[in-house]
Regions:
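Non-cytoplasmic
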Residues: 182-207, 227
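Alpha-helical transmembrane segments of multipass membrane proteins
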Residues: 14, 18, 47, 70, ...
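Transmembrane alpha-helices
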Residues: 164-190
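Loop-to-helix transition at the N-terminal end of transmembrane alpha-helices
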Residues: 28-67
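C-terminal ends of transmembrane helices
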Residues: 19-31, 73-84
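Loop-to-helix entry region at the N-terminal start of transmembrane alpha-helices
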Residues: 3-11, 62, 66, 83-135
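Short cytoplasmic-facing helical segments at TM-TM junctions of multi-pass membrane proteins
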Residues: 139-172
Length: 239
């Protein structure tokens, strides 16, 4: 793949087409979209510069530090409430690290902590866990605040604390994973996952690409479920 500056400029100029359409239809939305694209551009420039040196150095401690920093920044930006950030960051970092190493072992990576393998795998696992966990812990907290009498009723009828929390945990898991499972139903039927497209464009065979996608999907579902459970556990302990 050989993408030159002129080719990149041509691709960016294509944004003028939707911009002209929005200019005629909704200028307020155009301003909002322009701000989002400008922020995205700045983020990509900074990210590219950082990743260039991270991949250039390719040292174990640098790669681990990069994953810890990016996951912390992503958690702070995506999770608006303070009570979401600490439980999600701790559980996500620990669980995805363990399962990320498992993925690297399963795909027989030449070096577990090399940047081309370690950083993409950890990033994909943490992104999925972050989206699901924020939705899950928000549901859990809101359900407990809206129905405090249910927990007291269950405890009054002899249920332990864990048993009394079970309805709230069930609701959190159900709501958190429903969108993810719905998306999986469309894979292969309506669209091809971007990960699979990237592997095919990178020269991997269809068999190896699908095998890696299957491994990542299985591990992501498992690690995300455990991350959500540990997130709720940590929140319950510190709240």
């Amino acid at each position: 793949m050989n993408i030159t500056i002129p080719k990149l400029v041509i691709a960016i100029l294509l944004l003028l087409i939707p911009a002209l359409i929005l200019y005629r239809l909704d200028r307020r939305f155009l301003r909002m979209a322009s701000i989002v694209i400008a922020r995205l551009t700045i983020t990509l420039i900074v990210l590219t510069a950082c990743l260039y040196y991270v991949f250039l150095w390719d040292k174990t401690w640098v790669n681990i530090l990069w994953v810890l920093l990016t996951s912390g920044i992503a958690t702070s930006v995506y999770c608006k409430r303070r009570w979401q950030k600490i439980p999600i960051y701790i559980s996500m970092t620990v669980v995805t690290f363990v399962f990320g190493i498992l993925v690297l072992l399963l795909i027989d990576a030449s070096h577990l902590f090399s940047a081309p393998f370690f950083i993409p795998v950890m990033t994909m696992l943490q992104a999925e866990a972050l989206f699901v966990c924020r939705r899950g812990i928000t549901t859990y907290v809101l359900e407990r605040r809206q129905h405090p009498e249910l927990m007291e009723y269950l405890k009054g009828n002899g249920a332990s604390k864990i048993e009394a929390l079970r309805p709230f945990l069930t609701k959190a898991i159900t709501r958190a994973f429903t969108p993810a499972l719905s998306l999986l139903l469309l894979v292969g039927l309506v669209f091809m996952p971007s990960l699979l497209c990237g592997l095919l464009m990178g020269g991997f065979s269809p068999l190896q690409s699908v095998a890696f996608l299957a491994i990542m999907t299985s591990v992501a579902l498992c690690s995300t479920m455990l991350t959500l459970v540990f997130t709720i556990y940590i929140y319950t302990r510190i709240s």
